[in-house]
C-alpha cells in the first residue's frame, strides 16, 4: 500500500518523527529496485508493504513513461556561459535571489547543503551553498544551467514540485535516478502573486536530514518571504512578472497567437509550428531534425535558416539560439498548460483549457503527433475519472462529437430509464452505422 495509507501524516513529507531512517532507506531502495526490474509490467514490482508514498510512486510512473533512464543523468541541453547569464539575469526569480540568499544561503557554508533556484521548467538558475557539496553534486550534473525537470531527470524535489505545483520532499532512493540516491531534497514552487503562474522553485539538497518536516516548513517560509518581495516589486511595476515570458496559443482553427509583454501578436502557422516544436524539444533541434518534423518532404537547410531568420524578428533574436535551434528564454504554451493540469490529475481544468485542436490547420508530422498525444491524454483522463458532466462536455466539443468511446462511457453514467439515455444511445447507434459497425 502507499506509505501514507499505512502511516497517518502529511504525504508530502518524506521522513516523519519517529521513523527509523536506516530501515526506511533499505525498504525504499528495495522498492525502487523492484519497480525498475518490473519494467512497467502491470501488477508486478511493488508489494503492499513497499513503503513508497503515492506521490513518489506516481512520479516514478511518469518518469518511466517519459523514458527517463534510471541510471544516467544526461543533460545535452545545458545552458552555459553568456546564454545562462543573460537568461537568469532577465528572469523574475532574480528579483528574489537576495531574499533566498539571506534566509538560506548565508548560513549554508560547511553544512553539506546546497540551495538551488530553478525556473518554471526545472532549469537550475543558481546552485549555491557548501563548496564540498557542490563538488560532489557535479557527478550528478546538479549544476547551474542543467535541466532538472521531472521529464529529464525523473523524480526529484524541484522537478516534482513543479510538475505537481506543490511543496514536496524526496528522500534518498525515492529519486527515480540511482545516481541521486545518496541525496535528499526539499523544494516548493514560487508563484507570480498577481497571476498565480509558476515562476520557478526553491530547493534545499543535502543528506537525509533535509527530508524532515522542519526543512519543508523552512522552504515554505522562504517561498512566502520571496512572494512578499515580489508583491513589493509589483507596487512599482504594473506588468505582471510572468507577462515578461512570451506565450504561444495554438488551440482552435483561428490564427495562432504569440503573447508578449501584454501584446497579442498573430503569427504565421509556420512560425507557430517552429515555436511549438522547439518548446517540445528544450534540448534543441538540428536543422535536419526540425525539417523532418515540419514537412514530410523534408525542407532544405536554406529554407530552415530563412524561416528562423524571420522568426527571430518576431520572437526576438536574443530568445533563440542555434546549433542546435532552441528557445533560451522562459516560454509557455497552451499545450503545456493542459499537460500540467493532467499531470496534477485535474481533468476539469484540462478540459476547460483544451479549447480546440493543436494548430488545427497544420499537417506537419511533428505537430500532428503533439495534437494526437494531447487529445488522447485528455480523453484518457476523462475516461479514467468517469465524471458524467465532463464526459458530456467532451461529447459536445470539437474533440468528442464523434468519439464513440467517450459516448459509451457517458452512456454508462446515465439512468437507463431517463430520456437522455435513449438520446445518447441513438447517437452511439448513428456513429456505429457511420463507421460500418
From Swiss-Prot:
The record ties this protein, via Gene3D superfamilies, to: 3.30.450.40
Alphabetically list the UniProt keywords: DNA-binding, Transcription, Transcription regulation
InterPro entries attached to this UniProt entry: GAF-like_dom_sf (IPR029016)
MF terms from GO for this chain are: DNA binding
- For this entry, the protein name equals Uncharacterized 47.3 kDa protein in thcA 5'region
Query: Organism, per UniProt?
Result: Rhodococcus erythropolis (Arthrobacter picolinophilus)
Top-down, what is the taxonomic lineage of the species of origin? Bacteria, Bacillati, Actinomycetota, Actinomycetes, Mycobacteriales
Amino acid at each position: 500500500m502507499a506509505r501514507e495509507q499505512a502511516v497517518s501524516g502529511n504525504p508530502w513529507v518524506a521522513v516523519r518523527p519517529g521513523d527509523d531512517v536506516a530501515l526506511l532507506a533499505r525498504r525504499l531502495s528495495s522498492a525502487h529496485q523492484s519497480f525498475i526490474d518490473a519494467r512497467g509490467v502491470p501488477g508486478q514490482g511493488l508489494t503492499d508493504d513497499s513503503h513508497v508514498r503515492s506521490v513518489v510512486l506516481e512520479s516514478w510512473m511518469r518518469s518511466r513513461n517519459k523514458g527517463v533512464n534510471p541510471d544516467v543523468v544526461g543533460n545535452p541541453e545545458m545552458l552555459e556561459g553568456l546564454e545562462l547569464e543573460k537568461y537568469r539575469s532577465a528572469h523574475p526569480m532574480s528579483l528574489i535571489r537576495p531574499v533566498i540568499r539571506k534566509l538560506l544561503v548565508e548560513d549554508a557554508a560547511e553544512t553539506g547543503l546546497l540551495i538551488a533556484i530553478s525556473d518554471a521548467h526545472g532549469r537550475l538558475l543558481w546552485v549555491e551553498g557548501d563548496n564540498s557539496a557542490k563538488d560532489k553534486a557535479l557527478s550528478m550534473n546538479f549544476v547551474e544551467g542543467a535541466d532538472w525537470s521531472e521529464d529529464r531527470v525523473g523524480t526529484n524535489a524541484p522537478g516534482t514540485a513543479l510538475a505537481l505545483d506543490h511543496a514536496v520532499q524526496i528522500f534518498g532512493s525515492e529519486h527515480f535516478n540511482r545516481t541521486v540516491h545518496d541525496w535528499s531534497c526539499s523544494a516548493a514552487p514560487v508563484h507570480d502573486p498577481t497571476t498565480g503562474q509558476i515562476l520557478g522553485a526553491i530547493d534545499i539538497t543535502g543528506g537525509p536530514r533535509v527530508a524532515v518536516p522542519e526543512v519543508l516548513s523552512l522552504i515554505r517560509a522562504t517561498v512566502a518571504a520571496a512572494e512578499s518581495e515580489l508583491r513589493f516589486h509589483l507596487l512599482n511595476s504594473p506588468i505582471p512578472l510572468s507577462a515578461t515570458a512570451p506565450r504561444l496559443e495554438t488551440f482552435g482553427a483561428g490564427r495562432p497567437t504569440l503573447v508578449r509583454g501584454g501584446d497579442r501578436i498573430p503569427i504565421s502557422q509556420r512560425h507557430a509550428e517552429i515555436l511549438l516544436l522547439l518548446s517540445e524539444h528544450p534540448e534543441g533541434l538540428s536543422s535536419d531534425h526540425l525539417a523532418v518534423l515540419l514537412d514530410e518532404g523534408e525542407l532544405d537547410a536554406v529554407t530552415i535558416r530563412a524561416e528562423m531568420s524571420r522568426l527571430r524578428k518576431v520572437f526576438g533574436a536574443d530568445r533563440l539560439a542555434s546549433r542546435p535551434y532552441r528557445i533560451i528564454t522562459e516560454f509557455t504554451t497552451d499545450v503545456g498548460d493542459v499537460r500540467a493540469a493532467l499531470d496534477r490529475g485535474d481533468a476539469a481544468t484540462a478540459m476547460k483549457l483544451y479549447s480546440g485542436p493543436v494548430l488545427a490547420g497544420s499537417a506537419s508530422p511533428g505537430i500532428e503527433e503533439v495534437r494526437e498525444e494531447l487529445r488522447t491524454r485528455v480523453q484518457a483522463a476523462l475516461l479514467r475519472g468517469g465524471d458524467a458532466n465532463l464526459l458530456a462536455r467532451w461529447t459536445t466539443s470539437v474533440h468528442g462529437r464523434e468519439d464513440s468511446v467517450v459516448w459509451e462511457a457517458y452512456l454508462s453514467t446515465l439512468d437507463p430509464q431517463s430520456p437522455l439515455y435513449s438520446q445518447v444511445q441513438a447517437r452511439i447507434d448513428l456513429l456505429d452505422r457511420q463507421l460500418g459497425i
